[in-house]
Amino acid sequence: MAALTYLLWLTTREGLRPETAAALVRRFGTAEAAYFADPGEYELLSLSERLCRSLADKSLERAERILGDCDRLGVTLLTYQDAAYPERLLQLHDFPLVLYVKGRLFRFDEELAVAIVGSRECTPYGVAMAGRLGLELARSGALVLSGLAQGIDAAALKGALQGGGPAVSVLAGGVDVVYPRRNQGLYEDVAAAGAILSENPPGTPPEGWRFPIRNRILSGLSAGVAAVEAAEHSGTLITARLALDQNREVFAVPGPADAPMSAGTNGLIARGEAKLIRSAQDILVEYVTRFPHKVRQAPPLSREGAEARLEAAAEPAPEPVPRPAERNPLPLRPRSELEAMGDEPRAIFALLSGRALVPDEIVGRTEIPARRVNTALTLLQAQGYLNELPGKRFTAAVRFDD
């Protein structure tokens, strides 16, 4: 825990850029060593006066507050020293020292992860193409990444979820800050089925300058980046250029020659910086040999078929009515086993009887700290009392007699 506290201290220094943070841990070996370094050592590194002052502030209060916030919100901290930290990010000169994760922990190095990026102000064609790509990629076994903005981001994420896959949203602000607010429902769906990621601690506002910095993580986690619609000067092109610098494949959807919203993507194709794509198959064919265990040959959808499935996603599905024989399908266990549980595991089991919830929801409803909830879930599942469903949802696997 002490090592993590020092790491959070370092990453919250005022005026610290990602490349400088990475350089400091390379120079000192660990964040703890940087914390205890002599102030004169900072000055020898040609750091700004503002950053040197911030490094001289040894208060750990904010770091400890962040740890408390993560515990309360059910946010997992993944550091560059952890075995699960993506090698894809460690290859970057400005890798994030910490990732805050709300939802599932993915092994990104093993995933055919494709980032779909594009403009907030997009055309109906762009929305349709982003949704179709997200859907087709998810159906074929790829992991779709994007931001959470209106337009292309939202369409891609919705498509991926409708395609039956998880999705990952990389945010510029904290993982608990939904921006724009109208995407609250989408945010919750992505967190339940996949993950929300950020390098910034909970509560960080999504200020404009944070988005270009965020983009290196979006492209860095991915095997490839697909640009759907972008003007000639846009954040999408920043992400595409970052991807090229990171030796990632770049793909682009063509648009009308005179369409302002396709000027950026058409330019990528014209300069040979991106491969022209018309469907997800044009992306998948590049990765079949690298990810044979991931790519599934899902039958291609027509444009009309994809649109129909995406439109159906907006319609709430009716609640299934159980048949009489299904009303109590769970195996019966003696009540003495329930009484032998501790108070917290028993409360969690009772909450999950007849419903499926993700850990965040359990924390919110029981007010049990996230770490103890996760421990209880692991034990209850190991004892056969709980089942884990897709989207990291848990539900009761047994019932107890009266």
Placement of each model-derived feature along the sequence:
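Glycine-biased, small-residue-rich flexible motifs in mid-sequence functional cores and linkers
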Residues: 1-4, 71, 79-402
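Short, small/acidic-rich helices and loops at N termini and domain boundaries
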Residues: 1-84, 268-271, 385, 392
